[in-house]
Amino acid sequence: MIRNAALAVVLALVSAQAVATSDPLVGLLEGEGSAGLGAAVRIEPSMYKDAGVQYDLLPLLLYENNYVYLHGYRLGLKLQDTPETLIDAFVSHRFEGFPYDKLPASLAGMAGRDTGTDFGLSFERRGAWGAAFVELLHDVSGASSGSEARLGYFYEWQRSRMRTRAYGALAWRDATLNNYYYGVLPGEATATRPAYEPGSGMNVDFGVYADYRLTERWRLLGGLSITQWSKGVADSPIVSGGTQLKALAGFAYDFSPEKGAWKEKGRPIDVKLMYGKSTDCNLLPAMALQCTSTSTVDNTRIAGIELGRPFLEGMHGWPVDIVGNVGAIYHDENGLQQNAWAVHADMKAFYYGFPWDAHVRTRLGFGFGLSYAFRVPFVEARDQAERGRPTSKLLVYLDPTIDVSVGDLFGSRKLHDTYLGVGASHRSGVFGSSQLLGNVNGGSNYIYTYVQWRM
């Protein structure tokens, strides 16, 4: 239950001073109510023998206000935030473990080690000399159930358009954490792989991260770090060595509202109600309206509500609006498994530059974000089981739609911002390229109708 609540919060929706530690996404956004979207690639040699180099695609959904921050894989609640002190509680993804379907010879016959979700508390003290921080973390996902404590320091400087941050940290990991990820159980032992427990130990981390402001809204980001693992982990029969290098490179777009936007009436809220059915159609044919059948054997359904806040209107002078959304979708599994909720957050672009726009506003929309299902939907579990592949509660969320203004159709000015439309609710594992998403290669599609209005 704790795991579900923590991950659900992650999807709810970063300040320049929001997070201490080695997080490379600190400071990408500026201002209250800012949001951003981007992608990054993590590159690191696997700690496991003969497992090669791991490339992990990270979808970046970013949000900041005075109380919470989201960095794609880390969300925090700011308990105290002053120029000198930051205290926050957070949940974050742990990038460790190995999947069930891509085991090197050194891990053959071993049970998979799941990635984890940590709940943590952080204290940071700032000054002209830099910042010192302490973090306490504990796995709440039921994967390792291990704990970690970090003590570190970072210094940040700005030069022209580039902001750079160097850091160092000590990380003490308890035996439960190390034994889970780098130990060998007695039942997994072989002639060349003895049973082993690394026990607790201290890691040493150093790194440098930077982001470059290409334009007012586009950002490039990158970083390098090195970790010296404890001797207990380094000596494990399934570990390739005690030193690990990591690299990260990516980009982000800042959708922060322009200064003065909506200052007279405040930023409005969009409300959307939706209902739909599962489909065997792939996403692209469904988007092109070449496949719209919802006649399936399972006959599962969805119903949901979504709330949106506009961030940009007429972006760059184009007929494009940007809206940030959070929503909840109820999955009716038609008795095939227990019904359950899923929550999502996304940034969505609406294009309305059609020749007939002055008469009947028509919008093409495309949303990109993250979805967390409290129970993996039946259609995903079934399809992945048939292929012998893992499932994940956390996946990328895509939301292509087309709608028309009800007010324009019926000549009602009051209903101009009320829309009737059709869309496809799609959960995707991004072709198995993301450890954050459980290395899932697959997903689910639901075709739905909706009504949306502005408050």
Where do the protein language model's features map onto the residues?
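Transmembrane beta-strands of outer-membrane beta-barrel proteins
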Residues: G33-A39, P59, V68-L70, T85-A89, ...
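Cleavable N-terminal export/targeting peptides
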Residues: M1-G36, D50, T190, Y196-G201, ...
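Outer-membrane beta-barrel "beta-signal"
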Residues: L58-L62, Y153, T243-D270, G443-M455
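Transmembrane beta-strand segments that form the barrel wall of outer-membrane beta-barrel proteins
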Residues: L37-P45, V68-G76, P104-A108, G130-V140, ...
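Solvent-exposed loop/turn segments connecting transmembrane beta-strands
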Residues: S46-V53, L79-D81, G112-G116, H138-E148, ...
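Short loop/turn motifs that connect adjacent beta-strands in outer-membrane beta-barrel proteins
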Residues: T21-S34, Y67-E84, W129, Q158-T164, ...
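Outer-membrane beta-barrel transmembrane domain signature
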Residues: V140-V233, I238-G241, F311, L336-N441, ...
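Transmembrane beta-strands of outer-membrane beta-barrel pores
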Residues: V41-M47, N65-Y67, V91-G97, G127-W129, ...
